[in-house]
Amino acid sequence: MSIIIKVHARQILDSRGNPTIEVDVVTENGVLGRAAVPSGASTGEHEAVELRDGGKAYLGKGVLNAVNNVNTVIAEELVGTSVFEQNTIDQLMIDLDGTPNKSKLGANAILGVSLAAAKAAANELGLPLYRYVGGVSANTLPVPMMNIINGGSHSDAPIAFQEFMIFPVKATSFTHAMQMGTEIFHSLKKVLHDRGLSTAVGDEGGFAPNLAGGTEDALDTIKLAVEKAGYTFGDEIMIALDCAASEFYVDGKYDYTKFEGETGKIRTSAEQADYLAELAAKYPIISIEDGMYEDDWDGWKALTEKIGNKVQLVGDDLFVTNVARLSTGIEKGIANSILVKVNQIGTLTETIAAVNMAKNAGYTSVMSHRSGETEDNTIADLAVALNCGQIKTGSASRSDRMAKYNQLLRIEEELGSTAYFPGLNAFKIK
């Protein structure tokens, strides 16, 4: 047993220049575990609460209150606890907070400690984090969803959908998948440049061009980039969308004018489901995330019945990595996949519970970053530890995104012949 002797938090800056929290957990043997917490731009209403300071400093986005909660309340409780008792550590913090959404201490404070403790425990044993958390069965490298065109709340592009992603499903390994995705990313840059469009990137490293033709223009442009890179669109490369529909759901309608101006349409729930089905029929779209508003259960049901047998329907804002929300979705037969964001729920233990529930119900799991990231690469290890089979962590640019991809390259090398890359098998459409 190795005892925690120190828990210390500090305020650092994320990839958008906003404050976030970083936590150190130190054991009696002098072993350190360190974790930095990400932050989202488009957040679900049902997510655990990220504690911000308000006031003038950092435009109200400081996290010194969360830092103080770690350094006083949480530290006092955890010092003297075994670093290997992850469930106990997480439950102690949940009990200390005492709210259903972690609004007292802050999910950012609690998560930082939870992940730092797991890292310290892994380091104590001389194990990589993926092996400590996942045990001997942790060997699946995820297929990367590479976000190459940003829209919605992640850019200034006049497109409602937040992410247009490529899936290198015919890659033979994670290393090969990264090569394919990166080549297409550079090909897309040239395609956009030749059209006189901006090649500036959004929060997650994808391009944010002013595509006058909206969604279909983005998809057609990606198709051209894929082909110019020497790959087959619809075979070697498939498409995934993150609609982030909650971001443009207004007064019971899906209001595309919020991002697309006067060219955008306003759709009912039924029309939204029909529109997504039409896109999936026209383009090789294998996955759609948050195609409906997070509380539009009827809309989600209609969408699932319409295309859920052939398209992965991922719940992000819908499920917020929460077993209660996920359980409801499973009972209602809604969606068939869960997006996994550790900061939506706030502890490693609860994250693992959500992934296990999804697997037991036949739902797929997609490990995910947030738009506000740091150099912390914990989610790369967790994707392998939990055998998610898929990961969303941005484009082939920005060091905060590449940190995760590079860690996965290292893990694949370390696993050697035992590494498994699922390709199309990552998608178990019911």
Swiss-Prot record:
(2R)-2-phosphoglycerate binds at Q162, K341, R370, S371, K392. InterPro entries: Enolase, Enolase-like_C_sf, Enolase-like_N, Enolase_C, Enolase_CS, Enolase_N. One of its GO terms (cellular component) is phosphopyruvate hydratase complex. It catalyses: (2R)-2-phosphoglycerate = phosphoenolpyruvate + H2O. Its EC number is 4.2.1.11. GO terms for biological process: glycolytic process. The keyword Nuclease does not apply. Its cofactor is Mg(2+). Keywords: Cytoplasm, Glycolysis, Lyase, Magnesium, Metal-binding, Secreted. Mg(2+) binds at D242, E289, D316. Pfam families: Enolase_C, Enolase_N. The active site is at E204 (proton donor), K341 (proton acceptor). Pathway: Carbohydrate degradation; glycolysis; pyruvate from D-glyceraldehyde 3-phosphate: step 4/5. One of its GO terms (molecular function) is phosphopyruvate hydratase activity. Binds a second Mg(2+) ion via substrate during catalysis. It is found in: Cytoplasm; Secreted; Cell surface. Catalyzes the reversible conversion of 2-phosphoglycerate (2-PG) into phosphoenolpyruvate (PEP). It is essential for the degradation of carbohydrates via glycolysis. Belongs to the enolase family. This is Enolase. It comes from Flavobacterium johnsoniae (strain ATCC 17061 / DSM 2064 / JCM 8514 / BCRC 14874 / CCUG 350202 / NBRC 14942 / NCIMB 11054 / UW101) (Cytophaga johnsonae). The lineage of its organism: Bacteria, Pseudomonadati, Bacteroidota, Flavobacteriia, Flavobacteriales. The gene is eno.
